[in-house]
Amino acid sequence: MSCKIEKSELSGHIVCPPNKSYSHRAIFLASLAGNNSKIDNVLFSADTIATIEACRKFGAEIEEDSTSLVVKNSIKMNKIVPEIDAKNSGTTIRIASGIASLFTKEITLTGDSSLQKRPMKPLLDALESIGAKCVSTNGMPPIKITGKILGGEVSIPGNFSSQFISSLLICAPLTEKGISLNIKENLVSKPYIDATIATMRNFGVGVQTFIPYKKYYISPQIYKSTTFTVPIDFSSLAILLSASVLNGKNFVIHGNIGNLPQGDEVFIDILEQLGVKVSVDEEQITVQSPEKLNGGRFDLSNSPDLLPPLAILAMKTINPIEIVNVKHARLKETDRISILARELAKIGIKTQEKEDGLILESSNGFRGASLNSENDHRLFMVFCIAGMYLGDCTVTDHESVAVSYPNFITEMNKFGAKITIQ
């Protein structure tokens, strides 16, 4: 279904959603630890619910309320249900694949039509190199995995997805030998590896770093029960900040920022480079935006989810925005580079599509348009924000926001947006 968006102004105090990446990691690690491990401020979205259900299929006993969950009992071999549906969640299927390789039972992992187009081969090859049997068609889901991996030395390319490395890191301490992990090529999305290691540390497991983002060793260890509080999601915060830059008036964003590493926090630096004044207190963020932004060249190799919220700011820049080193954004839920180039051109932004990014330039010919988000949650949200700036826009596939920000439309309308589901 589509939404109609009219020109809007946002004001008031909004709460930023909890972090999706940390919610995923904490749910998996709490399920490996068990013993009443608790996660506070967890994000309940389609993707994280897929992770909760995957852990239940692995045998974990999980209780949840509106903002938290408790894992009573951990993942157990004798309770495993041998088929896991990760829905649309790449993080779920990739981390679950590593966990599946720890067991001798054959486990099938699959997902929706979009997930079945996302690459898994580098991870499957790595798991097979240490003893797993992995069966797939062209290295994509559905896949069948049979363990048991024993550990040892593993090499894996880092230029496809950091989720492959996170999967190996998480399963490594539960192997007999531990894992010596060698990352080939240039690693993309480095901060997500930092997030994985930080979450593991919170659950009592240490990772020895020999060369950052290149060589790690994880000895045999046991995950320990703990209480973990999920911080705000800087990926969602970036979208709210772009909304504030384009459409905000006394718009205040609240949330527990915390001190865990998040690569997307660089968006604050990006906004300041563009000429936006950003004020960050312990639990609230506000922006003061000039009438026109500066433009500039931005390397998003470590923060691919910032591509959509940065791209739409080209509507307000004096000079072009050039986004580079984000080729891996083509391997997200959609080819975000191609879709942004195509759809932003409809509203009058001058777009040049590059293999690894975009060059975006403002124009005098902005206009409303019908925008196709291709069921990508982040594209839907930023196209709505563009619609608030321009007026007279429609955007397809509003259901996609269930993946990361289920209340997006309700929240935006509460604070002044004019978004109508058609």
Model-derived segments and their meaning:
Residues 1-422:
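Short, structured segments at the rim of ligand-binding sites
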